[in-house]
């Protein structure tokens, strides 16, 4: 079976979830892009009280407004975004979802989904997940000279 990866990124308005920007690229293991998607969550992005707490609040007008004007990003209801995500997973036979800190992204998506729909499951079936951050750390440790990785790990233990 061909390995097809959906590399995901979310931006949240706060630590409890409230995803306001969800984007992904679907590609093969060699990086050949099959499709991409990026949307602002209308239920969150249009709420000033929520959005002022966002890490990137200063970029709302300098970053997102021009993207909306240039049709580089769309604003959609959460359910429509999730429906598109699910449809793309099926259409492109996605085998793995990857993100830099996938635990955060999946938790934020789950919290947002539950808050906006009352449902607890974002994805409809089990799928492999890859934490790019963890993968990079493990790859770096494997590249160290034999024995050095253990020494460095022991130096940092407390």
Q: Could you say what each language-model-derived stretch is?
A:
Residues 2-106:
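Conserved non-catalytic scaffold segment of RNase H-like nuclease domains
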Residues 87-90, 114, 118, 141:
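Short helix-capping and hinge/turn segments at secondary-structure transitions, especially at repeat
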Residues 93-103, 107-113, 147-158:
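Acidic, Mg2+-coordinating catalytic module of metal-dependent nucleases/exonucleases
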Residues 95, 119-122, 142:
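Short coil/loop linkers at secondary-structure junctions
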Residues 103-130:
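Substrate-recognition/cap helix-loop segment adjacent to the acidic, metal-dependent catalytic center
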